[in-house]
């Protein structure tokens, strides 16, 4: 039985290569299949490997086989995965994806999802997943273990749209005003204004000045610099200094 399955899975790999595929996906169930991993590794193409049911030690062993057989570490993407259909949310353990990333510098990480809905793969994207795998079906009511945890066409479209929006939202990490919000700066911020009518030569105090919108005048951050200085002109109540 082993020899039959062994030959079949090797034939499938050869078939996929004959079709011109440039990336091969190793399913969770094959992560401990040494001959299979060695064959994939010798090809030297890009590899995605799922890690359902595996611990860090088994992942390390699989990566060692692949790299020692010829696959470059930077060409490997490791998908965190839970092989339960559907996966309970409390068993997802998305933080394990970050553990994998930290444990194996140089690899890419992603997430293979078997939960219901699209929330978890979207969250994985926000956490740094570079690849998302989600099962697809035309009808969730069909028989078989995968269909219930799969997405129908409209759901898949919604997931992809949400992921693309998250990718746009990640940004550069530099904290500065965005072009879209700059126009709101003078509206939302405040300036120092006269709390009542102020005469020329009068001393500015906490009783005759206050802070109000818009933010087109002197910033309230200069409050201490204004207090106890002398007014150079007359001000009406609410007038910007």
Regions found by a protein language model. Name each.
Residues 1-241:
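Catalytic cores and adjacent flexible loops of soluble metabolic enzymes
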């Amino acid at each position: 039985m082993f020899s039959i399955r062994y030959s079949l899975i090797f034939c499938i790999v050869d078939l996929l290569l004959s079709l011109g595929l440039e990336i091969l996906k190793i399913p969770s169930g094959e992560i401990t299949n040494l001959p299979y991993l060695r064959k994939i590794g010798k090809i030297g193409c890009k590899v995605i490997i799922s890690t359902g049911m595996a611990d860090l030690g088994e992942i390390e062993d699989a990566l060692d086989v692949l790299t020692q057989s010829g696959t470059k570490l930077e060409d490997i993407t490791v998908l965190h995965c839970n092989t339960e259909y559907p996966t309970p949310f409390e068993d997802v353990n998305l933080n394990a994806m970050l553990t994998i990333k930290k444990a194996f510098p140089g690899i890419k990480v992603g997430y293979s999802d078997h939960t219901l809905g699209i929330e978890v793969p979207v969250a994985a994207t926000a956490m740094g997943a570079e690849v998302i795998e989600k099962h697809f079906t035309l009808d969730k009511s069909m028989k078989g273990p995968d269909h219930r945890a799969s997405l129908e066409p409209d759901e898949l479209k919604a997931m992809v749209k949400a992921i693309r929006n998250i990718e746009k939202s990640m940004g550069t990490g530099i904290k500065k005003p965005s072009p879209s919000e700059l126009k709101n700066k003078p509206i939302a911020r405040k300036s120092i204004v006269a709390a009542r009518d102020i005469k020329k030569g009068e001393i500015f105090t906490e009783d005759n000045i206050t802070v109000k919108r818009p933010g087109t005048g002197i910033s309230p951050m200069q409050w201490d610099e204004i207090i106890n200085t002398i007014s150079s002109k007359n001000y009406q109540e609410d007038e910007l200094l």
